[in-house]
Amino acid sequence: MIGALARKFFGSANDRRVKGYQARVKAINGLEPEIAALSDEALRARTAEFRQQLADGKTLDDILVPAFATVREAGKRTLGQRHFDVQLIGGMVLHEGDIAEMKTGEGKTLVATLAVYLNALAGKGVHVVTVNDYLASRDAGWMAQIYTFLGLTTGVIVHGLDDVERKAAYACDITYGTNNEYGFDYLRDNMKYRLEDMVQREHFYAIVDEVDSILIDEARTPLIISGPLDDRSEFYNTIDTFMPNLEKVADYEVDEKQRTVALTEAGMEKIETLLRDAGQLKGDSLYDVENVSVVHHINQALRAHSLFTRDKDYIVRDDEVVIIDEFTGRMMQGRRYSEGLHQALEAKEHVTVQPENQTLASITFQNYFRMYKKLSGMTGTALTEADELADIYKLEVVEIPTNLPIARLDEDDEVYRTQNEKYAAILAEVERANARMQPVLVGTASIEKSEVLADYLKKNGYKLIDFGDPKSMRKLYAAARAGKPAKLFAVLNARFHEQEAYIVAEAGVPGAITIATNMAGRGTDIKLGGSLEMRAQFETADLADEAEKDAKIAEIKADIERFRDMVLKAEDVVEIEPAKGSKPAKTVTRPGGLYIIGSERHESRRIDNQLRGRSGRQGDPGRSKFFLSLEDDLMRIFGSDRLDTMLQRLGLKDGEAITHPWINKALEKAQQKVEARNFDIRKNLLKYDDVQNDQRKVIFDQRVDLMMNESVAETVADMRHAFVDDLVTKHVPENQYAEQWDVAGLKEELRRVLDIDLPVDEWAAEEGIADEELLSRIENRVDEHMAAKVGQWGPDVMRYVEKTILLQTLDHLWREHLVMLDHLRQVIGLRGYGQRDPLQEYKSEAFSLFEALIAHLREAVTGQLMRVEIVPPEEEQPVLPAMEVHKLDPHTGEDEMAFAQGNFAQASLAPVVSADRSSRDPGNPASWGKVGRNEDCPCGSGKKYKHCHGR
């Protein structure tokens, strides 16, 4: 209460921050007449002037005011749109690296141009991130008019481009693309073997559109590049045949709140019997070590059958199981559940079971976007997640005032006992709205629910619009002109993804009824009366004559103006019956505009707010209302059975609803609980992923360093010496008598790994030989062996072979390391039962695994280079092609062999240049530069560097 009083007098922190921008807004407005007087050429020349000012030492903040004024004028000249003052504030928030919360219809796409232009002047590339290819292409094409006018280049990254096209797009001043494409390009770049093949530049500045969707809803979804493993499709199908034999409660228990499923004792016994009969059980018990993978697959099959619902979590299309995004209702083509879950779903649906995949590279959006030096975002709904965005991404949410006040009426929820009663009430409300020609958008939580509602409408005489038939929408327009309901409706879910933008854009036509899953269609405005752009695109496509096109567009404009007026007047006038003995009946008028009907509450308040926000854009009137039932997922999970019993006792009849602000508050509390739990899950997962992310950075940075160096000879030599050093230390420990040395073991290891037979036993038998002397002799012989290869094939060939083997071996071992980290992560939680912190245990063991990876890398690279045989070309080739390296077979253990072909005389590979030795100061290690492990230590001790400062 005191806080509310203080905010009333002093304003909130958000109000104060917004107020702080007013001086710069005033300055930008003051420049408007001067800049408006410039010619097009003079306006375009300002870009070069700004860049020169930056080169002379000015900062981006110093030139913000004139740069924003320039963009505003360019917007007026190219798009006919002038940035409002509140849009200038939004642009400043984006430039400062925070999140601008702007309501639907406030022009977020146009706002981005301000910060994009300013930051693109730095010449390091600006990435604009959208949620799908359509929006990336649309926004790039639309806003490029401003950028091109001002002399900047614009590229777009969409699915299907080759590397040459991608590299060209990233080289532009401004690049538009989807979060998936940016993330996958980063992963693919770090699997390349030449710097010139990499497509991305540095991660300088990104603006994320629909930032809540990408940084929160998809934060837990890793991007994974994978390769196929052995085909085990028959095994999945066998396991799936067991599922109908299991009974819920008796054989397994489901926790819907936690999304987990577990076998009971009876279920385990039943599964053991079924496995034994099918010949799939090894040993006596299901939980014997040999059956660990079997138990895993049983659990995944159980999850597939009990936690995943067709047409809600996934759909089946063209013999494939396609995941549905739970937040947007969109199909996630190309995405697959990991750890065998997707295969279990394929077996459940009796489609072709695809082979399991091995992870080759992965990253989460959380870690990808945190790589940018500056990150900002835009959305209509972020305040409910402000704590998470600040905690994880260090992004502050700033609520930008609307240009015009919001005139939408948000009504209290209506709660019914059963889903059938709820759907009947929704149908009745839709019919009432349709009768007065008010457009209705019905939001559903899944494809399944959207199709249930569609069936209700069909049974009551409504027809589904066929978007494949161009005449379908004409019927809707004709009915609107006549002022009569057409009784037509559209469905927007994953099945109709292709027409998404068109369906959404026309949801504001009088009498339109649109059923949409969650926030499908985000990014496309619903304009009252319809969309001029969409209608013009479809209705003038077949017209070749320009005069005919102009006439058609004029006709469409007149239509839309009339339709908009109809929608605004579609008010709902209701006479409320008085209570007995009270005042006479009163009349309530509810606004026209777009009517949003929610068919159930989502787990997240933000998703509900997004649905509401589709109505009431730019000061238009509108209304929203949620219809709920005690059988809805959120209500059921949070104990609606108790409420149902109470309502029955109170005498709530079938078809009656309860409506009260208290119910809204109770639901909001339930949603807050779910949001808090999901935040904790995401935060905890990030802590684990950060461990892998730190290691990923080291490996990826190392790869880039290796590719930047034309020669890795010194790196390879260091690895060789380190491996030999470790090998000798293992078998010939320091401060031990020669009689205690494991000479035979050392000799055998040298033969096995390096394929070299050295008289180690004879050297060890020499009187007074020390371990350092033994090490020195072995290293010298190994170096001589490698020098002979260089002499035989030439330094250019060996440099090429060394780099290729080093990079490919690093990739091979990194992939194996990822698998081990995944396995470790799955079981580490059990350490909690032993009173140990699973996260600390994971960090410790992951570090040990990483150390082992480095040791294995030294051994593998050294061994391969010692054994490598190079096949000479049969005839002269004009260019040096790629080398093929045959990797170690993990099953047979056969050695890797590298084969190179081509004219090696043309290779122009130079050795790594170390620091000038004459400039080394013995007392200042910082002046030594890179020192070889076998060089004398620059400190003057007389010892080798590896035994002195290089230890």
From Swiss-Prot:
One Gene Ontology term of the molecular function aspect: metal ion binding
One Gene Ontology CC term in the entry: cell envelope Sec protein transport complex
Cofactors, names only: Zn(2+)
Keyword set, alphabetical order: ATP-binding, Cell inner membrane, Cell membrane, Cytoplasm, Membrane, Metal-binding, Nucleotide-binding, Protein transport, Translocase, Translocation, Transport, Zinc
Matching Pfam families: P-loop_SecA (PF21090), SEC-C (PF02810), SecA_DEAD (PF07517), SecA_PP_bind (PF01043), SecA_SW (PF07516)
Topology term for the membrane: Peripheral membrane protein
Enzyme class: translocase
Entry's cofactor comment: May bind 1 zinc ion per subunit.
Reactions mediated catalytically: ATP + H2O + cellular proteinSide 1 = ADP + phosphate + cellular proteinSide 2
Main location: membrane
Location of this chain's protein in the cell: Cell inner membrane; Cytoplasm
PANTHER family in alphabetical order: CHLOROPLAST PROTEIN-TRANSPORTING ATPASE (PTHR30612:SF0), SECA INNER MEMBRANE COMPONENT OF SEC PROTEIN SECRETION SYSTEM (PTHR30612)
Complex formation: Monomer and homodimer. Part of the essential Sec protein translocation apparatus which comprises SecA, SecYEG and auxiliary proteins SecDF-YajC and YidC.
Function (record text): Part of the Sec protein translocase complex. Interacts with the SecYEG preprotein conducting channel. Has a central role in coupling the hydrolysis of ATP to the transfer of proteins into and across the cell membrane, serving both as a receptor for the preprotein-SecB complex and as an ATP-driven molecular motor driving the stepwise translocation of polypeptide chains across the membrane.
Protein name, per record: Protein translocase subunit SecA 1
Organism: Nitrobacter hamburgensis (strain DSM 10229 / NCIMB 13809 / X14)
